[in-house]
């Protein structure tokens, strides 16, 4: 389900990885003791994906998925007695990614935008990011200028960027920076 069309969401600055949806639960660690049992995967309660293209060439894609809360079993010692209990190892989580690209200048040049969000129920932790990108093919597609810039939207801001300029025909060269 998540593999088909996944390349539309991929880029050098990888903001979204669909393999995290349904992965082995590991969000919470017990405050004491040792994990002795936990599920191998997180249950996906619902998921939807829409991929398409308009007649004007705008490509779009949206993925939204909700995963269940999962519990693990821990073993700990209390007053010299070995005990076991369950603890929340993974809360309900909502994963979202949306992206679109629009052709400009010619059919091989595009600008794009992407937004991601991960929200975990009962947690004051959100992971959101946005990204803008472009691919410009100029001079009969011999000169290529690409770039992207991303930032997080939460308490701990992070930024990333990448620029690349390349030329091909008759010889090839490129300059890139991250």
Descriptions of predicted regions:
Residues 1-178:
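Outer-membrane beta-barrel channel domains
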């Amino acid at each position: 389900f998540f593999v088909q069309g996944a390349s539309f969401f991929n880029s050098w600055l990888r903001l979204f990885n669909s393999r995290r949806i349904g992965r082995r639960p590991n969000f919470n660690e017990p405050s004491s003791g040792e994990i002795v049992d936990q599920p191998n995967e997180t249950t996906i309660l619902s998921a939807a994906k829409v991929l398409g293209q308009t007649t004007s060439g705008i490509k779009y894609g949206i993925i939204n998925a909700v995963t269940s809360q999962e519990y693990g079993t821990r073993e700990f010692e209390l007053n010299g007695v070995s005990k076991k209990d369950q603890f929340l190892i993974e809360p309900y989580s909502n994963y979202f990614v949306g992206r679109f690209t629009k052709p400009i200048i010619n059919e091989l040049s595009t600008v794009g935008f992407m937004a991601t969000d991960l929200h975990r129920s009962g947690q004051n932790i959100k992971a959101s990011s946005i990204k803008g990108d472009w691919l410009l093919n100029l001079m009969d597609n011999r000169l290529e200028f690409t770039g992207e810039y991303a930032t997080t939207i939460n308490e701990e801001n992070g930024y990333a960027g990448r620029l690349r300029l390349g030329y091909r025909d008759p010889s090839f060269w490129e300059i890139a920076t991250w």
